């Protein structure tokens, strides 16, 4: 989740500076809470986390009085890209979630890794054993939409790679959006 937050907020800040309408606080809150529903998947639901956590995320956030965050956070599946009119915050969250993967090291600790869009796509195909031709087509379609979104961001000077050293040439952060240490 922290890796997804890092990528999403990194891009949201630049997007806003580039004139793309995005609510950084909403993007941040949704990215931090997008997988909170995994904690609601217990008992017989535990094996269905990949399918049910969206609902439990929405239920928890809605129940705590933050419906706007709930709508973005709960709709972060790549399959949500099949709908055409998604807010920028949703696109940023879906894009970030697609690129960030948690993998276990030799000692069993989870390590967050940020992949390029292409490498993330390859990683998904490598890991999914039940990849039917229909799923392959859906993932290709999702990848194409995410690639188009990435190209759109790049065309506006948004650097999607948070590990790059140096600032994006198209943006200088607004002081009001920076933490005190920055």
Each language-model region and where it sits:
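His-Asp-centered metal-binding catalytic motifs of divalent-metal-dependent phosphohydrolases/nucleases
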Residues: 4-5, 22-62, 71-80
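Divalent metal-dependent phosphate-bond-processing catalytic cores, especially two-metal-ion Mg2+/Mn2+ enzymes
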Residues: 2-19, 33, 43, 78-182
